[in-house]
Amino acid sequence: MSVNLNNKKESWYMFKIGLVIAFSAVLAACSGGNGTKNGEALLTYGNEAPTLTQNPEQLDLLIFGGTAGVGLETVKLALARGHKVTSVSRRPERMTLEHDNLNNVKGDFVKSDSYASFIEGKDAIISAIGVDASSEKITIYSEGMKNVLKAIGSNSSTQVVTITGIGAGDSKGHGGFFYDRIVNPFLLEEDYADKTRQEAILRSSQSRWTIVRPGFLTDDVSETRYRVLFDMDGVQSGDISRADVSHFLLAVVEQGAYINETVFLSN
């Protein structure tokens, strides 16, 4: 009987995923892509996108989840800017890049012994991991961050940057009607519950941390016209490209900027 109940639960969850994906496609086709604050464009709110300097000092970076999405874009940009990169992922064979300054290794965000030998001496650690939507409790973000902080030690000068998103902490309820009422509660509730826990763990730590909450991610090219906001009051998220998120991440670690800050990024 328990097997049948589990099968029914899984079938119902897959049906919800299909329904939300269909609605999401319609929504994406109608979306203007720009965020708002109190109904106005974000153009005059928050900070402009930072400017990357020419010929930055070489950094030694560790990136979790560097084989896809924002993580891969960040690896690409970091290498292009002359940095050393260690990409840690569960499936390193998915890496599409080869570079003299790239160390592509197998590791698990929640198992510090799988990456402990690579973490010493790193200038910054960036977490760009993601997991599939699930109705089961998710703990990878919070448990993984606990282990990362333990691995670097309380007196480390290493900057720790993590990507969460709209739905974590006080950003919940700022994604627009469809996202807030359908996508988040139906598909992403467990995901963002754990991202919220991860944010709390970082804030209570003694590390040099930065929490980055990007808006709705796209595969567009980088235009660096996004805004950097601190206050979510009256804000509704827009889009931002993964390339633009990587641009911000590199600015943060190169300039030592936004230390102990939680920021929201959106066009």
What does each of the following model-derived ranges do?
Residues D194, V212, I240-L250, E261:
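Substrate-positioning beta->alpha
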